[in-house]
């Protein structure tokens, strides 16, 4: 079995169904703690930092990973916090790409 962080995101062209709950739960178990699926059905994690600059630095590191993977999360930065929200926009749901990106964020930061 390939570790999620070692996989590559595959561009989604739409027309594919979002993952089912059983698949989501399986992939969620492969991620580190605190990742969850929010009320919108998006993958979500809140990261805390000692100040705004550290949160911004973290967001910039995520941006570099997202550009490499051509899969982009929503980031919300405030003082000492960076909220990361990931989903596949073209299908408005979760795909394996979302979990790959989350795993890469965890493994490289």
Curated annotation (Swiss-Prot):
UniProt-listed Pfam families: Pterin_4a
Keywords: Lyase
Any single GO BP term: tetrahydrobiopterin biosynthetic process
Domain of life (superkingdom): Bacteria
Catalytic activity as recorded in UniProt: (4aS,6R)-4a-hydroxy-L-erythro-5,6,7,8-tetrahydrobiopterin = (6R)-L-erythro-6,7-dihydrobiopterin + H2O
GO molecular function, one term: 4-alpha-hydroxytetrahydrobiopterin dehydratase activity
Class of the enzyme per the UniProt entry, highest EC level: lyase
Enzyme Commission number(s): 4.2.1.96
The family this protein is said to belong to: Belongs to the pterin-4-alpha-carbinolamine dehydratase family.
Annotated HAMAP family: Pterin_4_alpha (MF_00434)
Protein name (database record): Putative pterin-4-alpha-carbinolamine dehydratase
Species this protein is from: Rickettsia canadensis (strain McKiel)
Organism classification: Bacteria, Pseudomonadati, Pseudomonadota, Alphaproteobacteria, Rickettsiales
